[in-house]
Design a protein with these regions (language model features):
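Positively charged n-region of N-terminal signal peptides that target proteins for export
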Residues: 1-6
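Envelope-exposed proteins and targeting segments
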Residues: 65-69, 133, 142, 160, ...
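Bacterial N-terminal signal peptides
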Residues: 9-20
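Sec/Tat signal peptide C-region and signal peptidase I cleavage site
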Residues: 21-27
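Hydrophobic ligand-binding cavity/cleft-lining segments
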Residues: 27-108
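Beta-strand/loop substructures that line and gate deep hydrophobic ligand-binding cavities in soluble
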Residues: 149-200
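Glycine-rich portal/gate segments that line the openings of hydrophobic small-molecule binding cavities
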Residues: 58-60, 72, 92, 102-154, ...
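Hydrophobic pocket/interface hotspot
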Residues: 79-84, 90, 146, 174-176, ...
Length: 214
């Protein structure tokens, strides 16, 4: 808990110290993209520390749940992988996702890395609440899979591995291995909404790919 309090304090301080000439804020957030980038760095530093220092065990008040979901798409694996691994294509096909803010994009050792923040409107008790999910995506084109680690207040962690399997005859199976970590009070809400949003995204991308829109 003390680490989380220090993280939040650092996050607030980082936002205040940003230059006044940063890009203007968007309608969906009160922060500029530069401020969101500072939040991403603070969240990532905390995330890395937290993952090493603790584990989701009962005595920590946290829980971990894993789920696998899959969908078959009538399109070649190369095309499905290219479209699906580009998070910009998820906007408009995910009920919560409003936009993606990319902070850094680079390739190292054949792996494509993307540091990003997803701006989402998540319904809580029927009221949409704007949240920021800070994450890193690692795309492995040679293996036809990508991984994502993300962190959202209040200390909700999600690990993803999305695998693309060639079924032959121009068909592809997309399997998402999802791992959610949250407090025992939030884990059911996190898993239910997380799985539902991923299934909605899967269906939206399938329709867009098969129709030729993407």
């Amino acid at each position: 808990m003390k680490q989380l309090v220090r993280f939040l304090a650092a996050l607030f301080a980082a936002a205040l110290l940003l230059p006044a000439l940063s890009a203007p804020a968007r309608a969906d957030t009160i922060e500029t993209d530069a401020q969101i980038a500072a939040e991403w760095q603070a969240a990532w530093d905390f995330y890395k520390f937290y993952q090493v220092a603790t584990a989701p065990l009962p005595y920590t008040g946290r829980s971990r749940v894993e789920r696998d979901i899959s969908i078959d798409i009538d399109a070649p694996r190369e095309h499905v992988f290219e479209v699906y691994s580009n998070f910009d294509n998820h906007v408009g096909r995910h009920s919560f996702l409003q936009r993606i803010v990319t902070h850094k994009d680079w390739t190292d050792g054949g792996v494509h890395y993307v540091n990003f923040t997803a701006i989402e409107n998540i319904p809580i008790a029927g009221v949409p609440v704007t949240t920021k999910t800070h994450g890193q995506q690692r795309v492995h084109p040679d293996g036809f899979y990508y991984e994502t680690d993300s962190w959202t207040l209040p200390n909700v962690v999600t690990h993803q591995k999305i695998v693309f399997t060639d079924l032959g005859d121009g068909r592809t199976r997309v399997t998402e291995h999802l791992m959610f970590e949250a407090s025992v009070l939030l884990i059911d809400f996190t898993v239910t909404n997380g799985v539902a949003s991923h299934q909605e995204t899967q269906a939206g991308l399938k329709e867009a790919i098969e129709s030729g829109e993407l």
